[in-house]
Amino acid sequence: MMTKQRPRSPGRPKQTSDETSTYDVILGTASRLFMENGYEPVSLQHIAKLCNVTKASIYYHFTSKPELFKIAVTTMLQRGYEQTQICLMKSGTLTEGLLLIAEAKIARPHAEMETILREAETFLSKEQIEEIRDGERAIHQLLADHFEKEIQSGVIRQKNPLLLAQAFSALLMLGNREDITSKYASARELAEELVEIFWQGAGS
């Protein structure tokens, strides 16, 4: 399961609403900094300063920087899974769902996940890395399940649905390139072209 319980030392009093808010502020700030800058350039001191809390406060909620990174990334991936599911479920066709996913991702560009993880792996435990990979796999499997339905109905040629899911995700990373996004008037316009390119290869 991707949803993790917030760490609390044995015997520590139950969190108040203020403490919960502090947890969320730290987690949100850390998530943004990690995705913008990668793992190593981000310090707990910098996070504490931006959150207007002490470094000790961060350690109260998170045992270490690697654990904070892991929770930040898995929380983001869980949110991405939920948003992907919403886009796919509320759309009349898979094409419409992919377009919504692409538009949302392009509108909120961030560093390429694989690059960030490669840099952070040195500092993370095998268990932390596996939890993050599980989050990635869940999103790919969700997409793959929908591609499989289209394959079974004949909309898509017989292909590996998981490979299609990973290929689609990789294609969307082009939305992070300023030399590409600058040539389009909106995230929607670029999303439409990327989805069209994807379907040219995947469609029947």
Across the structure, where does each feature detected by a protein language model lie?
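Helix-turn-helix
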Residues: 22-25, 29, 33-67, 71
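Short coil/turn segments at alpha/beta junctions that flank glycine-rich nucleotide-binding fingerprints
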Residues: 36-40, 91, 112, 153-154
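Hydrophobic alpha-helical connector segments
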Residues: 71, 75, 82-111, 164-168
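Short amphipathic alpha-helical elements of helix-turn-helix/winged-helix folds
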Residues: 29-33, 108, 171
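Hydrophobic/aromatic-rich alpha-helical bundle segments in the mid-to-C-terminal region
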Residues: 116-122, 129, 133, 137, ...
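Helix-loop "lid/cap" segments that line or gate small-molecule binding pockets
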Residues: 84-87, 103-109, 117-124, 197-201
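N-terminal intrinsically disordered/low-complexity leader segments
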Residues: 1-21
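Amphipathic, non-transmembrane alpha-helical scaffold segments
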Residues: 27, 73, 77, 129-140
